[in-house]
Amino acid sequence: MNPIEIQRPDFFTFRLIRSLKSLLLPAMLLGTAAVLPAPGANANPSTAESMVIAPNLESFTLENGLQVVVIPDRRAPVVTHMIWYKVGSADEPEGQSGVAHFLEHLMFKGTKDNPDGVFSKMIAERGGQENAFTSADYTAYFQRVAKEHLPLMMALEADRMENLVLSDEVVTPERKVVLEERRQRVDSEPGSRLREALNAITFVNHPYGSPVIGWQSEIEALNKEAAIAFYDRFYTPNNAVVVIAGDITVEDVRKLADETYGKIARRAEPGERLRPKEPPLSGERRIAVSDPRVRQESISQTWVVPSQSTGEGRIPEALDILAYVLGQGPSSRLYKSLVLDQEVAISAGAYYQSGALDDGRFGFYASPRPGHTLEEMEELIALELQKLLSGGVTEEEIDRAKNSMIASAIYAQDSQSGLARLFGSALTTGLTIEDVQTWPSQVRAVTIDDVLDVARTYLKGMPVVGELRIETPTEPAAALSDDQQLKDKS
């Protein structure tokens, strides 16, 4: 319950292309159903110019400002019901890092009509699945149930949107749960500690530099008043998006939405999501985490770049293709050079974190084989980047990237829950339904010049570097003999 989506390369386009393949697996967070042929899906990438993602999607807005998105899918008598709030850790008041995630925990503590535990019990008794997650830009809750239980799911979510009951008796022990979660998932994991430190030195001025789970000292200070204030400001219908995918009709959903969410009044106007901008990187920023528990050393390099939301024109799609050419898949330049040809690395790749409300990140990573070093990895990554900057990319590389990306998007439509998550995350990070639906045609329009332009514009400066190292225990100095000690004193 309540996994945190700590910032990592797994946002909008990157998720759409690569990670949505994993959304087809039952083990995925959203617990998707078995894969069935998607209605109207065409797996031929050559049709991408006219391809529209979820063409039967419809959307409407209630009088209280709640946006509702409906994605009919009649292949199985089940529905995925998700509610997305346009608030995440980057929207937290100063000094209250972790309150967004803390409130996510507290949302399961009940209302007057549905006390602590009743919500989850009702879902379990009906054979359903539920979960929730917090990121820097949004907080989401979902249930997956047989379609006849959708009215109950909407009633339960609407109830806790308006009637959450909190007390010190509930808040205090849950704060201890979150602190223990931090100890287990961050403090005890060298890789998580490095990611947290790397975020902090990448975003010094922007709140993306604070961890989603929060800093320990600030979690310890969170209380009932902080949670209620956050809830009252942001958990209001005009700051939320409901996405329902499955065996339903738009007419039925509209009626249910009016009867449940439609009765909730606006509690607040959250206001425009204005955040401090990150100044251009100057000088070198480098962090290393050494720990005896590290099993495999690795190095990462990161640049702050435009996201799908902040990038103009074809910049986001060009960055995505650049990441694919350089480091995604066995035919990518980094993998082929470092892993296959030179056999100096166990893994090597690139990513583009595009699905953020503000700027995203572009990065490289590599893990050396035994007998090779992180310094060697860094030099070889720089060499491959320089080759691309000076020699360009080929039409074949661009086409291969486009075909793979679009094919993944086509097959991803087989996942009911995956589509619900895709549109929910997009609509809470500054994008529109049209942005998502027409993404394949935007990818097809990218040119070689577009890819080279973004490479030369955004990867020309020094990256932020993170190193994960195996800590070698320092052997204690050998004890001096009595004769040696006497000799040293003379």
Q: Where does each model-flagged region fall?
A:
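Short pre-active-site segment immediately N-terminal to the catalytic Zn-binding motif
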Residues: 88-96
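Non-catalytic beta-strand/loop surface segments
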Residues: 40-89, 114-149, 185-238, 263-309, ...
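Active-site SXXK
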Residues: 97-111
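Solvent-exposed, non-transmembrane alpha-helical starts
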Residues: 94, 151-154, 255, 310-315, ...
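Short, polar/flexible loop-turn hinges at active-site or ligand-entry regions and domain interfaces
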Residues: 109-114, 161-170, 393-394
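Bacterial N-terminal signal peptides
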Residues: 15, 19-35
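N-terminal secretory signal peptides that target proteins for export/translocation
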Residues: 1-18
